[in-house]
Amino acid sequence: MSKQKIQLSDHFDYSRLIRFVLPCIGTMLFTSIYGIVDGLCVSNFVGKTAFAAVNLIMPVPMLVGTVGFMLGTGGSAIVGFTLGEGDKARADRYFSLFMSTALIAGIVLSVLGMLLLRPVALMLGAEGEMLDYALRYGRVLMLSLPTFILQNMFQSFFVTAEKPLLGFWFTVGAGCTNMVLDVLLVGILHWSVEGAAIATMLSQVVGGLLPVFYFLNRKNTSLLHLCRTQFEGGVLLKACVNGSSELMTNLSMSLVNILYNYQLLRFAGEDGVAAYGVIMYASFLFVAVFVGYAVGSAPIVSYHYGANNRKEVNNLYRKSLKLIGVVAVVMTIGSMFIIPHVARFFVGYDENLLILITRAFRLYGLSFLIMGFNVYASSFFTALGDGVTSALISFLRTLLFQVAAVLLLPLLLGIDGIWLAVTAAELAALLVSIGLFITRDQQFHYRKAE
């Protein structure tokens, strides 16, 4: 049984569900790990100022790259629904449309990003040596935006194509490329922040461009193939609306990261930005589990909803909430013990910074108890084709509540208010998610098996 191929049309018990989503979780975890290696190399081989500069400018290309998540999640829901209806040719046509759109958008945004990078860096508060490092790093990443957007998009479509493990191996290839080149270019050849950026750029070629050739091959054994397509504005608009929650999530994360850095520069200076960078790298590992599960399980929900199998949608809904609850408790407890050791890898050369990071993370890490439910709620409604509800959760959770918390809590609690802001925002979003789970069931009927 363990070697039997798992298909979207299957009934999912806990074992089958976990095995199906594990490659997607692994993909997200590995992506986080090679991002961490980036930070480790810059911090230890170039220095604290360069590390702070990279973390200051990093949200900018990440913000622009969210287009890939929007087309990936919104488009895969449409493609999965179409496959559930049994129309393979139309699913391929839609898939090809979304891929072409992602590539064109990446080229346009790359040009705009290069033109606007310096004024944006100045607006973020970069100056002197930090500004120089930020621009040198950011310019290279702006060049690689087309492949970065494709890489983000394919994360969802590999699952819909019933090839989550292949998607994982593409990510492993990209990650190994990044890590090896980080050590070579930054640690051995001393190419400074440009070396780290070039390593990231070439890894995105592996993760974003090579899958194009796989899906172009008519002999590939997945459910999806790239083919001739045509512009269908209605379908593209629906994908954008449906994926707007993921766009909002990732867009908001970048905007909020920018706001965090701005506040921390005011309250703690360069050390605050460096501390936040370490916390972000560490939290990537925990957030990756929730995001990987949400992305991995969404195509199953889309397929069964498209096939009008409400009983299986209910089964997936119930099992997912239970799994997320157990994992959230385990990860939160575990994170409190490992953070001092993680921090030492990054900034072992600065004892005061180590103390700041350890205290800050123990406040920030409380959010892991709640976060998974909100991530899943947004993804679940996207999978059902309810992009408006999904976008509402994402907008409130990742933008409105976090902006309010990071601006208001420091007035009451000082710098501790900044570290507690994400937990407060997740708690407020959880109340919204619970309310929407209850009210939207009247339309989708996922809380009771039919």
Predicted regions and their residues:
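Small-residue-rich hydrophobic transmembrane alpha-helices
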Residues: 51-111, 148-167, 275-339, 371-393
